[in-house]
């Protein structure tokens, strides 16, 4: 299995499932998306996660994904500030992947139970609109995924100014646990505890 990151919170799994594509020019510094897949899923309907027109759907390409939706909030006031958020658990080829979308609050007990035994956790870390780096590190400790991919943060030349940088998250882990990878993460090799991805420029 392979995972591609296109910046912000947008990923594609095995060329078949796109998660949270962003609309054109909605995220500073991120490339325009022109993707194809058999399916696209969205955590919520804000422009930086809901680029419906940026994904060409090619049906019946044989991909078999089992997807579970977990309701959550985009803020810590039960959605009063930014509305609802959907966490997705994706099961494919014997692996469990969770994408937390724009999670803006702590996980409750039931959510934590559903999010156990993860191979990959995609988690926002930038703060302001979502949980911040410290809160994200706590959640990683609670869920103990095999590998965590940080998302929704600011880099040197991409992302919103209000967001924190990835080093604010990685400082909570040992250097040996962190690996910087490219645009594509292959899941058939040994996975680091934290995989910091890049996206095509």
Predicted stretch roles:
Residues 47-94, 171-191:
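Metallo-beta-lactamase
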Residues 79-143:
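Active-site-proximal loop/helix segments of hydrolase catalytic cores
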């Amino acid at each position: 299995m392979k995972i591609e990151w296109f910046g912000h919170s947008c990923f594609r799994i095995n060329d078949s499932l796109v998660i949270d594509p962003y609309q054109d020019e909605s995220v500073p510094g991120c490339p325009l998306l022109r993707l194809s897949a058999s399916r696209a899923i969205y955590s919520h309907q804000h422009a930086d996660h809901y680029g419906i027109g940026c994904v060409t759907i090619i049906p019946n390409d044989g991909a078999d994904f089992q997807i579970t939706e977990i309701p959550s909030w985009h803020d810590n006031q039960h959605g009063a500030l930014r509305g609802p958020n959907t966490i997705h658990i994706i099961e494919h080829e014997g692996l469990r992947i969770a994408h937390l979308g724009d999670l803006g609050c702590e996980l409750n007990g039931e959510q934590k139970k559903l999010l156990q035994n993860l191979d990959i956790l995609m988690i926002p870390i930038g703060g302001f609109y979502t949980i911040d780096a410290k809160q994200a590190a706590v959640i990683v400790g609670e869920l103990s995924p095999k590998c965590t991919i940080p998302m929704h943060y600011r880099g040197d030349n991409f992302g919103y100014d209000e967001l924190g940088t990835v080093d604010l998250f990685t400082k909570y882990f040992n250097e040996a646990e962190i690996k910087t990878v490219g645009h594509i993460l292959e899941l058939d090799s040994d996975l680091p505890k934290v995989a910091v991805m890049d996206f095509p420029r």
